[in-house]
Amino acid sequence: MRNQRRTVVAAQPVEYVEPRRRYIPYPAAPIVGAVAGVSGVLVIISTFFSWISGSGVTGWSMMSKGGFGTSQNFLFSTGGSRIVFSGFWSLLFGVLIVAGAVTLITGWGGANGLVLTAGILGLIISVLSIVMIYTLKLQSLTPGAGLWMFAVFSLIAAVAGGVGQSQMEYMAEG
C-alpha cells in the first residue's frame, strides 16, 4: 500500500448574510396589484363574451373571423363611417395590466404607470366602440356584455394604477 497524504484545510468563518427582502414601492402595492391583476384577467376574459348583442359577435370572433361592416381586419371593423375595435385590444391591454400587477405584487418594481396607461387606453377603445355601436340606430344591435366588461374593468385598472402612482409620489415626497 502506498501512503496517501491528506491535506486538511481549516474552515473559514462563515459570514451571515441577511436574506434580501423584496422591495415594495409603497405599503398598498400588493393590494393595488391584486385589484389590477383581477381587472386585467377580466379584461382578457371579456374578449370571449358577446361584444355586439343580437349578432353573436364576440371580441374574439371579430379578431379571428372579421366583424361587421365593409372593412374588417384583426384590429377593427369599419362601415358607414363607424369603427368598432376587435378583441385584440382587450387581449393586449389585459396582458399589460396583468404584467404591471405582477410586478407590483412580487415587489419587482412599481409598474403603476403601465397599469394606468393600459387601463386608460382600454377604456378609450371600449367606450369608442360602445358609442359607435349605439350610433348605428338599429334596435337589434347594442353593445354586448363583453364590451361593457372591457370598459368597466379597464376603468377599475386605470383607477388602481392612478392610486398606485399617487402613492408612489407621496412616498417619494416623505
Please place each PLM-identified region on the residue numbering.
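Compact integral membrane and secretory-pathway proteins
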Residues: R2-G174
